[in-house]
Regions:
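Non-catalytic, conserved peripheral segments adjacent to functional cores
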Residues: 1-111
Length: 117
């Protein structure tokens, strides 16, 4: 693991419940009623995983747009409907063409993770 403590401090990040660190950067002023109660209709966060960290597998209850801006690439595993992924999840590799090797230039830099996956 690299020492990302200076970056965490500089960006004002806090531990995220699913692993890594984050900071909420925007919250919509409108609310929607959900089975889990009233929630903001949208929000945005900065999310940081160190090189050797993984986010805990979890079911997302709302659509999530992941935008990758780090060096190298990030694998996002999709598929499953509960506490564990499917046996053969769909893997999408996100990578910034400007910051990865030429062979990675075809990788997208964002993905929509649909609610319920």
């Amino acid at each position: 693991m690299t020492d990302v403590s200076p970056l965490i401090d500089a960006m004002g990040l806090a531990p995220h419940p699913e692993g890594g660190h984050y900071r909420r950067t925007w919250t919509a002023p409108t609310h929607v009623d959900t089975p889990r109660g009233s929630r903001h209709s949208a929000s945005a966060i900065i999310f940081l995983l160190d090189r050797d960290e993984e986010a805990r597998w979890h079911l997302v209850h709302s659509d999530e747009l992941w935008i990758w801006s780090g060096p190298g690439a990030l694998e996002v595993h999709l598929g499953g409907s509960g506490d564990a992924p499917e046996a053969d999840p769909r893997i999408v590799t996100l990578g910034s063409p400007a910051k990865t090797q030429a062979s990675d230039a075809s990788n997208p830099v964002q993905i929509l993770v649909p609610a319920g996956t």
